[in-house]
Amino acid sequence: MTIAGGGGARRWRLGSVGGTPVYLAPSWLLVAAVLTLLFLPTVQLAAPRLSTPVAVLAATSFPILLFASVLAHELAHGGAAKALGLPVREYVLTFWGGHTSFGSDLRTPGVSALVSAAGPLANGVLAVVGWGLLRVVEPGLPAVILASLTYTNAIVAVFNLLPGSPLDGGRILEALVWKVTGDRDTGAIGAGWVGRVLAGVIVAWFLLVPLAQGRQPTLTGAAWAAVIGYLVWSGASQSIRLGRARRSAAGFDLRPLLRPAQVVDVRASVAAVPAAPWGVAPPAIVLVDPAGSVVGVADPAALAAVPGPVRPSTPLTAVARALPATAVVTALQGSAALGQVARGIGASDVLVAVSEHGVLGVVPRDVLLAALQPPGR
């Protein structure tokens, strides 16, 4: 397990599946701790004879199995994309769940819908398998853990299919509107507005249902309503902004903004980077792995600061920083390019443009922001 970081984010690399790296955000440990504490009373009720340390250990099985369910959800997205000919850059498991990054845009409504539906389908299959196992497992602690995991997968599957961004169901709705109207941006904006309505419904459900039953909403229920409602509202708003931005970006062209870049193998030392000619600004250094995929960038100033005697023994990675997948853009023109740029500049101070032929160049964030400013500002 190795640590990678980019754009200020740090995560642990757990390994790879099908050649695609799997990362875990450290914040997931907080989720695991909270879930363990919440599940501990259930374990103690099901197995009262267990000592507290053993009960805590048993309670950790729930977040671990839930982790496997989230990973299965993301692997299903990635597997569907690969089956449809799309590259998958990485799987990331985070505080709020996970996400899958793709190497190119989901180019058609059908592809977008199929890839989006694969994740909830995986959770649905796990719920069905769990339900079948519950019929043969003897009552006791294993059955309680299995039942909790089964119900959780069923809830995750159903919740993710709700038709509003940023949920998978919202992506499916976006694809449907895209197919009917021929305009993806209309689908993104529409799914975003439905997501906002859904956020309000979620909050109302948690708060108003207890009142309708003559009970006061609990503090825990109110907290969950606030957190889930905020997440859905934020994701829905981002979908609306992205749709509007793409709609107004038909004339956007990234190519004039590209700066030269020198491509170097990530396994090389600092000495492998030749010095720039006198009076010429050194190009950005882009690190690639043996497969040619961009993995990081090195600042020329940091390279120049390495003393000559130790340059051959200093690996490039010592003066480089990893890039998040969103900082590598594959589209150069129009709304697709602007959409990738919008995601990338929020995660990194430099973007790397690539094509099927390799690295095309880099664009610093400040250059992009200046180019995106409206005239007269």
Model-found features: residue ranges?
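Small-residue-rich helix-interface/hinge motifs
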Residues: 2-34, 56-113, 147-152, 156-176
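The conserved cystathionine-beta-synthase
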Residues: 263-282, 288-289, 298, 304-308, ...
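Lipid-exposed faces of alpha-helical membrane segments in multi-pass integral membrane proteins
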Residues: 30-34, 60, 64, 118, ...
